[in-house]
């Protein structure tokens, strides 16, 4: 029939036929109830109102999007983490086994996926575990994976596990184990527990951190004859001054502490020992001239007898 400029067909999406079988149900212009095909798309009405969300019809479950269109040929993750698959005609698999994209699944009497298996939705991988979408660290077939709070799998990145151990999630999601690997130009070794075992720099969440004994290093660390100070979260100090144990240090843009050189900070002059600590309450002779550094490590000026070049006349 033609009604209000729309081509309407009345019936239900069929499991064996994409076209509905017309029932004895009567659809009125106002107050219609049941399935209606409008311009080739199926919608479900109750008392004239287009429905959304979960609907049950003839013992089968359907899910209707916000615009009333029904899900078909796709997975859906419900708000409680349960997982469903909707067939080509819209109904969810019910109390059966099915093979989808090469993987086997079991569906219960409530249409939910049973057991554990991977699913691909919107180009992302999800792990169904005991019938629910898994989150956090998971183990599958002896490999470790990390799943976001929405269940999607992470890959191509460094992550810390719940014990603070460092792991690298490769392109297919599993953490490297029992092998060596070159990542972003740096070499790493991973043990059978998927923990990085050698001391090496990593980039995690856009920040440089140092892997040491399988965990993120903190505090003072030495690498390639340079000293670094790593904060409690493992990030390194850079482009800043720092006082530790009453000693003053300055860090360059790449994180190493300046050493054996002059440093000017906020208009004050400092000179740094080989370990990066600024001179303090002591004399320095350099270039044949003497300089005095005060308790705050700044070079003394004006309050002592200094020459035009800031050198002390100490003999």
Question: Where do the language-model regions lie?
Answer:
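Extracellular adhesion/carbohydrate-binding repeat motifs centered on closely spaced tryptophans
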Residues: 1-315
